């Protein structure tokens, strides 16, 4: 009997595949695209840099001049008490957010908006960046990290620089437990070894010259713990006919 695909099992919404979103620090997005940004710029100070269990990149807590606090993706080389700017007249410095039409060609950018004002949708993983290739009247061409050329609305915002946390994948997990916790934080299931791939001493379905259970996979509900694998107390198996 076949197995359900992971995407099918995730769709049921069981606790195994449910993301622990109650641990997340909050929504990481740009502030609203208001008159302050459309006609000038707004300055903010980085008051903290925190870790969000739900993402790979560090998150900066920014307090703006108008008293507003926002969580934004931290760029490389940023530090607490640094200033960042948001708006059409902001300078071209790492961490500053501007409309694509105001950013020079060849500049590395990240957290690009798909539509103006949506808060940022593309290039948000640690260590990633996209390159602004060329400007046109009604679109801006950007080379994504995958190498794909994608057209964006010139009024969509992006942040200058590279997302912090680069080189994350170069550090090995070393232990299966570390891998387990990294997957669990994002609502993913740790991989397990199949019983038919084991030796006979390790699993009731193990052993043999090829990978097959070698015996019926139905088992009594009253079987001992080490034997209770497969279809437990199944009334029937196989397809309905």
From Swiss-Prot:
Entry's Gene Ontology molecular function annotations: rRNA binding; structural constituent of ribosome
One BP annotation, GO: cytoplasmic translation
Cellular component GO terms, alphabetical: cytosolic large ribosomal subunit
Chain residue ranges for the region called Disordered: 200-241
Key words, A-Z: Ribonucleoprotein, Ribosomal protein, RNA-binding, rRNA-binding
NCBIfam families with a match to the protein in the record: PRK09612.1
Family: Belongs to the universal ribosomal protein uL2 family.
Name this polypeptide is given: Large ribosomal subunit protein uL2
Species name: Methanosphaera stadtmanae (strain ATCC 43021 / DSM 3091 / JCM 11832 / MCB-3)
């Amino acid at each position: 009997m076949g197995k359900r695909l992971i995407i099918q099992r995730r769709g049921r919404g069981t606790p195994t595949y449910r993301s622990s979103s109650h641990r997340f620090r909050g929504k990481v997005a740009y502030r609203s695209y208001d008159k302050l940004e459309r006609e000038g710029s707004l300055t903010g100070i980085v008051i903290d840099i925190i870790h969000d269990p739900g993402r790979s990149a560090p998150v900066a807590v920014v307090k703006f001049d108008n008293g507003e606090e926002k969580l934004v993706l931290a760029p490389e080389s940023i530090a607490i008490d640094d200033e960042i700017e948001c708006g059409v007249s902001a300078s071209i410095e790492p961490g500053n957010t501007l409309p694509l039409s105001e950013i020079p060609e060849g500049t590395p950018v990240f957290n690009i908006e798909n539509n103006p004002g949506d808060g940022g949708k593309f290039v948000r993983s640690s260590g990633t960046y996209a390159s602004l290739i060329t400007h046109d009247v009604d679109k801006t061409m950007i080379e994504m990290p995958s190498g794909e050329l994608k057209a964006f609305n010139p009024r969509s915002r992006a942040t200058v620089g590279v997302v912090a946390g680069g080189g994350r994948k170069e550090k090995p997990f070393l232990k299966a437990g570390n891998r387990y916790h990294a997957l669990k934080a994002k609502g993913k299931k740790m991989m397990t070894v199949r019983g038919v791939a084991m030796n006979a001493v390790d699993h009731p379905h193990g052993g043999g010259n090829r990978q097959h259970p070698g015996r019926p996979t139905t088992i009594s509900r009253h079987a001992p713990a080490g034997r209770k694998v497969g279809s437990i107390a199944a009334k029937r198996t196989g397809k309905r006919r």
